[in-house]
């Protein structure tokens, strides 16, 4: 049973956050991702985020993790085209 009703939307919010907060040069840490999810009323644990990100990758999202100076950063590298790009 989900911890909250919004829990079912967690994967969608993760994609939304990655689309809005990252690009090919700038990533987001798991701590930052947790804070962003909390803003949407979704509680999550670091361990579950690893699994969620892996599920999104298996589904076809081009999510890359990179080790930075002190942290590990996740970013959504390739995206759908924006209307302006067409």
What are these regions (language model features)?
Residues 1-86:
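Short, basic/aromatic recognition patches that contact phosphate-bearing ligands
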């Amino acid at each position: 049973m989900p911890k909250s009703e919004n829990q079912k939307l967690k994967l969608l919010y993760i994609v939304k956050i990655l689309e809005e907060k990252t690009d090919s040069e700038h990533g987001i840490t798991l701590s930052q991702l947790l804070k962003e999810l909390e803003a949407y009323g979704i509680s999550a644990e670091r361990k579950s985020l690893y699994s969620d990100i892996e599920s999104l990758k298996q589904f076809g999202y081009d999510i890359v993790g990179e080790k930075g100076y002190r942290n590990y950063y996740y970013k959504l590298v390739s995206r759908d085209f924006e209307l302006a790009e067409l």
